[in-house]
Design a protein with these regions (language model features):
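Membrane-embedded alpha-helical bundles that form the substrate/pore pathway
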Residues: 107, 150-154, 158, 199-224, ...
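Hydrophobic alpha-helical transmembrane segments of ABC transporter permease domains
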Residues: 138-141, 197-247
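Short helix-terminus and kink motifs of transmembrane alpha helices
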Residues: 32, 107-119, 154, 158, ...
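Cytoplasmic coupling helices
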Residues: 163-174, 178, 248-293
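An intracellular "coupling" helix at the cytosolic face of ABC transporter transmembrane type-1 domains
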Residues: 199, 276, 280-283, 287-322
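Juxtamembrane "helix exit" motif at the C-terminal ends of alpha-helical transmembrane segments
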Residues: 22-39, 74-79, 103-123, 127, ...
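Transmembrane-helix motif of ABC transporter permease domains
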Residues: 10-19, 55-106, 126-166, 237-262, ...
């Protein structure tokens, strides 16, 4: 699934992790110095309300740093192991990551907007308020600007992700078709090439971006939780710890991920077995269309019993997983 689209090297994913770690370390260790070299001021940490949130010196430096880091990583693999899908796999993945990060920052911008807006609404309802309608309308316009960016970004991201995933499916299709002589003996080989690549593409389109967005959301709001932790000194049951909201969010995310992984450990195997029993049942029906000796009631009943048993197992395991 992956070697057909991404560089076919055992070192690729290790290089992704290593380069990401190096890039993150350099950014958090030297971003102030890098900004000073470019004449950018990163000292202002006050949240900017409205679309200006995306055009601060800090964001400008990040955009430039991310683009250079991605370009250097891609340049290495273009030289090391060039292939047809390299541009789509690396630059496409990088663009999706950036778009997802930007969409999370839209949520941060809206979160920053809520405080002054609702403070203004609350003050407007008190006696002797100095809040004017112009101020309220100005805040509403700022929200509309951010919301417009969010809508446009969502539409463009989904459009690009659809094309990205179909290119991935094309790469998988070409890979398996080139090995058709070897895989044709596998039960339901035609379905594996056609349906499994389609299902994989659909799953990645629906869940892949959601997973990345969930991780990005966590990291985007960690600085907010760090600041809010100044006003919280302890957690229930646990007691006093430094920056409790910050560490509690990380611990809960890890705990929830591990819990779901353990609880759902049997589901992939059952889904795979489900494909096999469904394929066996369908294959017998197909044979019965051209051969009267096949697809007899007794045989079909036995095959469908296997389908039923596997589905009932799936229902049971999904019950406690859900």
């Amino acid at each position: 699934m992956f070697k057909s689209f991404f560089p076919d090297s055992r070192w690729f994913w290790l290089s992704v992790v290593a380069w990401s770690a190096v890039s993150i370390f350099v950014w958090y260790s030297f971003n102030t110095q890098l900004g000073a070299m470019l004449g950018l001021d990163l000292s202002n940490t006050e949240p900017v309300i409205g679309v200006g949130h995306f055009f601060t010196d800090s964001f400008t430096l990040f955009y430039l740093y991310y683009a250079i880091s991605l370009a250097l990583f891609a340049l290495f693999w273009f030289q090391f192991t060039p292939n047809r899908w390299l541009a789509w796999s690396i630059f496409g993945s990088g663009l999706i990551l950036f778009s997802t990060y930007f969409s999370v920052q839209v949520s941060v911008a809206i979160n920053n907007w809520r405080r002054p807006f609702f403070d203004a609404v609350q003050n407007a309802l008190t006696a002797g308020s100095t809040v004017t309608s112009k101020q309220l309308y100005g805040l509403l316009i700022q929200f509309a600007e951010v919301a417009f960016i969010a809508i446009v970004l969502f539409v463009l991201t989904r459009f690009f992700v659809s094309h990205f995933i179909f290119r991935w499916r094309t790469a998988m299709n070409d890979f398996y078709v080139s090995k058709w002589a070897k895989v044709r003996g596998i039960e339901g080989a035609s379905q594996r090439v056609q349906e499994d690549t389609m299902r994989f593409a659909s799953i990645m389109e629906e869940l892949g971006v959601s997973m990345v967005e969930a991780v990005m959301t966590l990291f985007a709001f960690l600085p907010v939780l760090w600041e809010l932790s100044k006003y919280v000194s302890e957690l229930p049951i646990i007691g006093h710890i430094a920056s409790p909201l910050f560490y509690a969010s990380i611990a809960w995310s890890i705990f929830g991920t591990l819990l779901l992984a353990i609880v759902g450990i049997k589901l992939p195997g059952l889904e795979f077995k489900n494909q096999r029993v469904e394929a066996a049942y369908r294959k017998e029906l197909v044979y019965g269309e051209d051969n009267t000796d096949r697809a007899q009631p007794i045989t079909l009943k036995e095959l469908f019993i296997n389908v039923r048993k596997n589905y009932f197992k799936l229902y049971f395991h999904y019950m406690y997983f859900n």
